[in-house]
Amino acid sequence: MKKITLIAGLLACFFSIGALQAQEKKTNQLQMRKLNLAQFAIANLYVDETDEEKLVESAIIGMLEELDPHSTYSNAEEVKKMNEPLQGNFDGIGIQFNMAEDTLFVIQPVSGGPSEKVGIRAGDRIVMVNDTTIAGVKMSTEDITRRLKGPKGTKVNVKVVRRGVDELLSFTIERDKIPMYSLDASYMMTSKIGYIKINRFGATTHEEFMEALARLKGQGMQDLILALQGNGGGYLNAAIDIANEFLGGGELIVYTEGRRNPRREFFAKGDGKHQSGSLVVLVDEYSASASEIVAGAVQDWDRGMVVGRRTFGKGLVQRPIDLPDGSMIRLTVARYYTPAGRCIQKPYESIEQ
């Protein structure tokens, strides 16, 4: 009798779950019909011509604004700009610059880059790009950057004002791949203490870190200071690879979990190159996401000291969803947790403020 009752209970549970799923599907379909009908009505009945692309983008943005602050929409151009720092390179002329008094000042040309090769120097002021004046005309930094960047192999003509030279200098620069490095610095502070500063967690970060680590160990480094101040994060895998260098085999680095994403755990492999020796991780209020994964793993396993200010508090995992026109939604699909089970995500209200 008990067996029959148990089976009956399981069947009732099964059918209840099925009914709930069917109801959820029906509700979703109803909402989609509602949205499609609204779009159809505006496109076909509104009194004036409408910009369909703008309306759709506004609808997407409106939906995401009802979620968390990190679920965002980016158009195709914004996606390209967003990915460049993490991919490790972009096509351009290879200069670092500042805008001052409505003029582009070259801070320094990238070593070995196309601008340095043709003779552009630190302190030069670029005033014209392809016969278009960019100085003193209130042109936005974005517009100037767009004019200077371009596919590898294409050329751009610039005119430069240089201190001590009376006439304008003309240069033709052939654009090339410009590397963007993840490491700002790596050097020996004492005969035994090394220092490495990582500014982002990108596609080349682990490779750059390993090269720096090997070089410093070759100079006698025993202890390491890892600086993550101002590092706003980047790729999850890059953070896991860096943390792996400090932890013992089988030690949990981080795990992620969400409503539709079951718990996923990431462990150290045991092949790290700095598992012994002291470790200090420097952080500040701008250290976020991937930086907090590394710092959290080091702290929870008591592998080293975490020194600095309270970190930013971004404990969410975004999934990039590519759209047909090259635009993208970054949708929060899970939270990440440190080995001790801490979710360091701060309240959304404090982010918006």
Positions of PLM-derived features:
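Bacterial Sec-dependent N-terminal signal peptides
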Residues: 1-28
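PDZ/PDZ-like peptide-tail recognition elements
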Residues: 58, 70-108
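Cleft-lining beta-strand/loop regions that shape enzyme active-site pockets
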Residues: 21-31, 35-52, 75, 105-108, ...
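Conserved functional hotspot residues or short segments at active or partner-binding sites
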Residues: 339-353
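Structural motif
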Residues: 123-125
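Short acidic, Pro/Gly- and aromatic-enriched capping/linker segments at domain boundaries
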Residues: 323-334
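An acidic helix/loop motif centered on a single conserved Asp/Glu
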Residues: 50-68
